[in-house]
């Protein structure tokens, strides 16, 4: 009889733990999942959370500020247990972040920038990555010649990359910027990049030695434009930041202009965000004991023809 009671108690405890695990609800929002990196990030968060038995809801804002705000508002009103946001915008959505904090909902962001209302942002060191990409590009043209720049100001990380590039160029006056395009739209960003860079490439045909873009999605479009113009690998150096199988394939491809990228381990960052959320929101560990500041930095790696085979799957 005693053995039966022990077994019943153990079963009840296991059931309670299972119920508790299943009851933990995580809201996951990516700002624009048509960007490969954001899709990788959000989908990995969802998959890792499900491994823990959590209920997850993965949302795509499709690059629309209004949609992103509404999705955050709805998750807060619903009372989810926690949120992980991929490539969000802390400045634009400060009100939502504050509302989540006031509601006792812990928030971790990924490659979004810091906010006083979130636990922290999981990110590579943008300053290190940006300087590495900038110096690499200039090295491929022997620190002289003409370049075009494709920027993006609305994302914190992309903006930092552009600002670091500007500093590097200032210290290397023998490299001239023939033109730059700043991506303004997020919902139809592919068309924005294609239209802006097509015009710059046409205007400066035959005079461009290198092209820098703030993230790989832009670089892929630029590569297509260059290929359509009849250029061959080596005619122009094309360097960007993010990493992904399509970019690696093009770096390897002798017919592509893609020269190098700085590969961010988005899957590792997403998995780390889920693990940290579990330790803080479920296990009760103090954030300060795990992450002593507003950022949790994850290392990135420059990928070019010398090591691309290590990254291709």
What positions do the PLM features span?
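A residue-level marker of the well-folded mature domains of exported/periplasmic proteins
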Residues: 2-8, 13, 17-313
């Amino acid at each position: 009889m005693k053995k039966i009671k022990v077994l019943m108690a153990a079963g009840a405890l296991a059931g309670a733990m299972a119920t508790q695990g299943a009851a933990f609800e995580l809201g996951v929002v990516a700002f624009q999942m048509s960007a490969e990196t954001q899709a990788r990030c959000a989908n990995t968060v969802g998959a890792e959370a499900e491994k823990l038995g959590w209920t997850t809801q993965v949302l795509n804002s499709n690059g629309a500020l209004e949609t992103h705000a509404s999705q955050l508002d709805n998750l807060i009103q619903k009372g989810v247990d926690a949120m992980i946001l991929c490539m969000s915008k802390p400045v634009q959505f400060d009100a939502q972040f504050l509302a989540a904090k006031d509601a006792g909902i812990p928030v971790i962001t990924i490659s979004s920038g810091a906010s006083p209302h979130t636990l922290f942002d999981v990110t590579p060191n943008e300053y290190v990555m940006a300087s590495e990409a900038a110096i690499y590009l200039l090295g491929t043209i022997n620190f002289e010649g003409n370049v075009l720049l494709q920027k993006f100001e609305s994302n914190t990380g992309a903006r930092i990359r552009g600002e670091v590039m500007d500093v590097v160029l200032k210290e290397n006056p023998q490299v001239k910027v023939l033109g730059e395009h700043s991506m303004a739209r997020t919902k139809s960003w592919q068309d924005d990049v294609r239209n802006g860079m097509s015009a710059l490439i046409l205007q400066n045909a035959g005079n461009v030695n290198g092209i820098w873009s703030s993230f790989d999605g832009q670089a892929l479009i630029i590569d297509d434009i260059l290929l359509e113009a009849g250029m061959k690998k080596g005619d122009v150096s094309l360097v960007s930041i993010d990493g992904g199988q399509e970019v690696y394939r093009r770096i390897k491809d002798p017919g592509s202009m893609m020269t190098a990228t700085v590969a961010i381990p988005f899957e590792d960052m997403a998995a780390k965000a889920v693990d940290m959320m579990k330790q803080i929101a479920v296990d009760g560990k103090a954030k300060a004991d795990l992450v002593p500041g507003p950022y949790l930095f994850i290392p990135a790696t420059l990928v070019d023809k010398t090591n691309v085979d290590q990254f291709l799957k």
